Amino acid sequence: SIKEIVKEFFSYTDGMTMSAKKDGLVNMGGFIALNNAEIYKKATVYNIMFEGFITYGGLNGRDMGALAVGLDEATEFDYLETRINQVAYLGAQLVEFGVPVQQPFGGHAIFLDANKFVPTIPRNEYRAQALAIELYIIGGIRGVEIGTILADRDPFTHKNRYPELEL
């Protein structure tokens, strides 16, 4: 089952973070999960200072309950099939309209290729970020830049690091 695959997959990890607003199917929250008791103990100090006690992390009971249901539902075949098909449909429509997108499509998002979409914007003017902002201003489309800004500057030279992909 999908749940068994997910459980085994995460059994091999040391830890993970999750924004529950996306794949947890809730309106707020997130979590950190760790397989190392020593790191967990260190992390709890910061959790208490900034988020709330370790048993609820600043979330109320309703939101924690909704997150539990959302995580369960997000591993159901019908939900995943529908979501993946919706993403694929959107991607195919964009390709049909000539929009440069990264392929193959996944199940989480469609990534526009800013290097091909807006090649006239110089890289040092953050073309992927500019594209994301304009899509929001013009169409209300909420996205995020995965490119030069996310790559951050070189810690020693303080110069931009330009990744191959600007999405």
Go through the PLM ranges and name each one.
Residues 1-99, 112, 122, 129:
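Conserved PLP-enzyme active-site core in the AAT-like
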